[in-house]
Design a protein with these regions (language model features):
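Class II aminoacyl-tRNA synthetase-like tRNA-binding/catalytic domains
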Residues: 2-6, 32-299, 466
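TRNA-recognition modules of translation machinery and tRNA-sensing kinases, especially anticodon-binding
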Residues: 245, 249, 254, 262-273, ...
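Ca2+-coordinating acidic residues in Ca2+-binding motifs
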Residues: 136, 357, 484
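Hydrophobic alpha-helical scaffolding
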Residues: 53, 177, 248-251, 261, ...
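Metal-assisted phosphate- and nucleotidyl-transfer catalytic regions
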Residues: 208-238, 310-430, 453-473, 511-513
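Intrinsic disorder/low-complexity signal
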Residues: 1-37, 512
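Short aromatic/basic micro-patch
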Residues: 131, 352, 479
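Alpha-helical packing segments of well-folded alpha/beta enzyme cores
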Residues: 183-187, 304, 311
Length: 513
């Protein structure tokens, strides 16, 4: 152990030195951004791993990963993380130079919140170019190791779901959160750079975009006694007496609403929460999740497919560039081969095949491969079929088109055969369906006929039909489940582990304790 040497004078490094651009908007450097706290990311994630800052006085704030005493207790190594990066920064405390040395040691071992000021020096240890030699340490939050649920090193993901309010402090969920952030930022970047307008669509709605009926009801009448809830003569709840005067629900998709702006602003997208009242406990479904739904005017299915493929590749590339440390962790701990899989996505064109061609491939494969559900024309393919195509047959993403109209939504444009629609799904390894999209039916008479065939309520869709009555335009779009995208780029197996507070039947994560 080398002696902790602190120069008598050391230039203090503050945030604007690293990121001066954040101060341009207000010019209030000292008042706003000069907080005398540097993100660990801005030190060790630089090209030289922080060596250019050696000799600078800096202040960091974060939480302890470990505290280890050395030299008979004269020194202590404090491993700090502030969530800005996967990597930690080691800080060295000298009992003779940190006045509250014993207080720091008594504060706990894991999860203690500290603010540490010191000089950055070149580290003598292998694997860490720099370390921080502390001069001042402030204990902001103690953490009793006997009570802290994350005190031990490793926890199962199932256990972490029971303490969702604390699990962001773990390596795995922290890395997921950073990748999720990058995917969200990349989403806006992709569409904004291409001239799309971001539209906020409603969460409370009366429209069922999918026609599935698996929607949550929004009502204020449950505050009353059951016997006092208004009912119609046939015994059903009388929603005309409810808050909105009709049966209001939580949206399953923002697509129909965002189409209204597509027919005025051309290229638009929505990115927000959606809700499904499906009694599903699978690793691919949630009751509350986020959807990205672009709509493009003057666009056919070919345009739709091209934009969707570009979007997937753009997000994948962005994460690989900006979250290399997190992906290295996932490669080591979650999915060996993850990086090769993602590189293959970037370097290979997606396979294009029709639904009918896919059924033929699966039917032939069924002669030697056992599927839980045997493939046949008209089957709504499951994840076992989708993953077989992407992982076993083509070994890359697949864009499947021209589905039977019976298994797709009413708004999808009919092909000339009258049996299939101009729909497309993007299937990817590990996940199966990642994106679902279509060219929308722009002809009023055809759309009305489809609504009737599917026994849907035309009266609740009159506003949607107005888009075809007044200046109809050919347009296309797609929807992507954001959590599935995060699963795809991280290798995480369960969708409940890629959203901060997962909701599924009989569960509300952070409220389970």
């Amino acid at each position: 152990m080398t002696e902790v040497v602190v120069p008598e004078t050391a230039e203090e490094l503050t945030l604007p030195t690293v990121h001066p651009e954040v101060c341009k908007a207000t010019n209030k450097v000292d008042d706003v951004w000069k907080r005398r706290r540097i993100l660990i990311r801005d030190i060790i994630c630089t090209p030289d791993k922080g060596l250019s800052f050696v000799g600078k006085m800096i202040t960091i704030g974060g939480w302890t990963r470990t505290i280890r005493k050395q030299g008979g207790g004269k020194f202590a190594f404090v491993v700090m993380n502030d969530g800005s990066t996967f990597d930690n920064l080691q800080c060295v405390m000298d009992s003779e130079k940190v006045s509250n040395y014993e207080e720091v040691l008594k504060a706990g071992n894991v999860g203690v919140c500290l603010q540490i000021k010191g000089v950055l020096v070149k580290s003598p240890a292998a694997g860490q170019p720099v370390e921080l030699h502390a001069t001042e340490v402030v204990v902001l939050g103690t953490c009793d190791p006997a009570k802290f649920p994350l005190a031990k090193k490793r926890h199962t993901l199932e256990h972490l779901r029971d303490i969702a309010h604390l699990r962001a402090r773990t390596n795995t969920i922290g890395a997921v959160a950073r990748v999720r952030n990058s995917c969200a930022f990349a989403t806006h970047l992709f569409f904004q750079e291409r001239g799309f307008k971001y539209i906020h669509t409603p969460i409370i709605t009366t429209a069922d975009c999918e026609g599935a009926g698996e929607m949550f009801t929004v009502t204020t009448m449950l505050d009353e006694k059951v016997k006092d809830i208004p009912a119609t003569p046939d015994g059903k709840i009388d929603y005309t007496k409810d808050f909105f005067g009709k049966h209001a629900k939580m949206t399953v998709s923002g697509q129909l609403n965002v189409e209204t702006y597509c027919c005025a602003l051309c290229d638009v997208y929505t990115f927000g929460p959606t809700f499904r009242a499906e009694n599903s406990h699978s690793v691919r479904h949630l009751s509350e999740f986020w959807m990205i739904e672009p709509e493009m005017a003057f666009a056919d299915l070919d345009v739709d497919m091209a934009v969707a493929e570009d979007y997937v590749k753009f997000c994948t590339s962005y994460v690989m560039e900006h979250n290399a440390d997190d992906l290295a962790f996932f490669e080591k701990q979650i999915e060996p081969g993850l990086l090769d899989r993602l590189k293959n996505v970037l370097e290979s064109p997606f396979v294009h095949l029709t639904y009918t061609e896919a059924i033929n491939v699966l039917t032939e494969a069924a002669k030697t491969h056992k599927f839980e559900v045997q493939p046949y024309w008209g089957l709504d393919l499951g994840s076992e079929h989708e993953r077989f195509l992407t992982e076993q047959v083509y070994k890359r993403p697949v864009i499947m088109t021209d589905y039977p109209k019976e298994i797709k939504a009413f708004y999808m444009k009919l092909n000339e055969d009258g049996k299939t629609v101009r729909a497309m799904d993007i299937l990817v390894p590990k996940i199966g369906e990642l994106i679902g999209g279509s060219q929308r039916e722009e002809h009023l008479d055809v759309l009305e006929r489809r609504i009737e065939e599917m026994h849907m309520s035309k009266s609740t869709l009159e506003w949607y039909l107005d888009l075809r009555r007044y200046g109809t335009v050919p347009h296309s779009g797609f929807g992507l489940g954001f959590e599935r995208l995060v699963m795809f780029v991280t290798g995480m197996e369960n969708i409940r582990d890629v959203i901060p507070f997962p909701r599924w039947p009989k569960n509300r994560s952070e409220e389970r304790r």
